[in-house]
Amino acid sequence: MAALLEAMPDLTVDAESLPTIRQLFAALAAGPEPDGLDATEHTVDEAAGIVLRVLRRSETAASPRPCVYWIHGGGYVIGDRRMDDVRLAAWVRALDCVVASVEYRLSPEHPFPTPLDDCERGLRWVHAHADELGIDIARIGIAGLSAGGGLTAALAQRTKGDTSLPVIFQLLDSPMLDDRQVTPSSRADWLAVWSRDSNRFGWASYLGEHSGAETMPEHAVPARATDLTGLPPTLVLAGGADGFCDEDVEYATRLNRSGIPTELHVYPGAPHGFTMFPGSSLAEQADRDVIDWLRRQFER
């Protein structure tokens, strides 16, 4: 665990550091294309910059493949569609699925609801173009990490009951769900990777004029939703040393109480974003759990 923490960057994100951190993440994401896979780019809205990166096996499938619609993390303020290529490519190889990773506009330049709107538009594009992508429209689920997990939860809330946009699951990896920072884990002073101050900046950037308000627009903050019925089966991953741990466990508990088939995995000692480092034993265990769960969802 100590080696993992040492390898992870200390991200103190604020208005001053944001441009530099964005450049760092862009450089890290600019790696080679995944071996043995087709990686294609599809423009949803050129003016808005909404782009989908689609990963799939090179060989033609005998039947349409299931799909994971992926929303990247970055505190609502950093990141891009390529940053999780290594991890997502492993899912494609293990499950013979298609992964579509969406590029959405970032805050603070584009506060709520723009990022969520972009994610919804990308998902609608995937549904509309499922045939040409070789996707089984009856086996599309949504997933995301950190802020992407928050957007995934919000997207599931927004689209529940929408028969034109069915999703069969939501996978929430260390999701950023609650702007209030009132849980014990969110108040810890030893948080690695994503500090309390960075979290405050991320939420303020995303919520814009609504930041700090007692009430929020619908679907802006997933943890503030009062009705969680009708959501799809859910997997929640939480790191025991993540500031989001308590809010993630609480959200999973609320889903379970609302009758949603919910699986919760808490990884002792894991900091925020640990699944972004596939060489660590914790990340490898988490992805074994994820692949097992995804396989079960696709086979239902």
Q: Residue locations for each model-derived region?
A:
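Gly/Ser-rich "nucleophile elbow"/oxyanion-hole loop immediately N-terminal to the catalytic nucleophile
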Residues: 127-142, 162
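Short amphipathic alpha-helix adjacent to the substrate-entry channel of hydrolases
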Residues: 82-101
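Short beta-strand/loop motif that positions the catalytic acidic residue
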Residues: 236-238
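Alpha/beta-hydrolase active-site loop
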Residues: 110-132, 290
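Hydrolase active-site cap/lid region
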Residues: 157-213
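Gly/Ala-rich beta-loop-alpha elbow adjacent to hydrolase catalytic centers
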Residues: 144, 148, 152
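A glycine/proline-hinged amphipathic helix-loop "lid/cap" segment
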Residues: 1-57, 298-300
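Catalytic active-site module of serine/aspartate enzymes centered on a nucleophile-bearing elbow/loop
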Residues: 279-300
